[in-house]
Amino acid sequence: MAFAMSSSLTLFQYQSFGKKPFFSRRRDFAGCSMMNPLVARCNRATEICCVVRKDGEAESLVEAENDQLEEEVMKPTSIDSFSVVLRSERKKAERRTYLVAAMASSLGFTFMAAAAVYYRFAWQMEGGAVPLTEMMGTFSLAVGSAVGMEYWARWAHRALWHTSLWHMHESHHRPRDGPFELNDVFALINAFPAVALLAFGFFHRGFFSGLCFGAGLGITLYGMAYMFVHDGLVHRRFPVGPIATVPYFQWVAAAHQIHHADKFNGVPYGLFLGHKELEEVGGMEALEREIKRGVKVFSSSPNQS
């Protein structure tokens, strides 16, 4: 084991204590700068440093410092590499966790919605007559509420989430630590009216009940599409496959990235019609640049998710 010995040799030490230096013979100080008046101008407090190796061979202090510096440089590099690996594994685990939750909720809602539609109209047709008016009302409200949710989300995003509810929505604009974020609560909040409308429309007969049932279906479909495009395609919380190469979805993803960059005072606040909002504020050039950047990132990504 190498160790360093440093001592300040002075005449006082050897005359007062009369002890020998460790690991060496008594030296003749006649030629030393402290005894010889010819060299008295030399520094009396010269510090001698050496590194003794296990095999007895001396090593210069500069070489020892260089070796130590190399070790210190190597340590952070290895630690950083290890941290990158751990962070990558953690992100993969978070994506798997969120993917399982997203798929479970999506499949669950899809199955329940399909079963509800089938059993509701089967129950309505027990008398033999096909309720065409009610069916058309249900279908119309399903489409209308899905489209209307885009405008509701745009208004709520601008007027609520970025103002009074920013303490919750802020988690979506910061790096995420874990598979979920506080902003996910908004998905649960929007699910309550959808479930209530579906339940009321399912257990009651009549045209109004059919409209409520259709509205609940539309909100549910929009929520599933929003989660798949916003969380999967834009923020890559789970893989979405080849839809990232579809031009329309490239516009959607690029427009939402511009929202996070806050280049146009937060515009666009909507998701599926975000490129239309950018067109109104003159942001199409920025949108084209963001699309090219996104395509380049997707092409260079090993997962291409």
From Swiss-Prot:
UniProt comment concerning the protein's domains: The histidine box domains may contain the active site and/or be involved in iron binding.
Sequence motif: Histidine box-3, positions: 230-235
Bilayer topology: Multi-pass membrane protein
Catalytic activity: all-trans-beta-carotene + 4 reduced [2Fe-2S]-[ferredoxin] + 2 O2 + 4 H(+) = all-trans-zeaxanthin + 4 oxidized [2Fe-2S]-[ferredoxin] + 2 H2O
Pfam families: FA_hydroxylase (PF04116)
Biological role: Nonheme diiron monooxygenase involved in the biosynthesis of xanthophylls. Specific for beta-ring hydroxylations of beta-carotene. Uses ferredoxin as an electron donor.
Main location: plastid
Family statement: Belongs to the sterol desaturase family.
Membrane-spanning segments: 98-118, 129-149, 184-204, 207-227
Organismal lineage: Eukaryota, Viridiplantae, Streptophyta, Embryophyta, Tracheophyta
Native species: Oncidium hybrid cultivar
Domain Fatty acid hydroxylase: residue ranges: 146-272
Subunit and partners: Homodimer.
Protein name from the UniProt record: Beta-carotene 3-hydroxylase, chloroplastic
UniProt cross-references to InterPro entries, sorted A to Z: BETA-OHASE-like (IPR045019), Fatty_acid_hydroxylase (IPR006694)
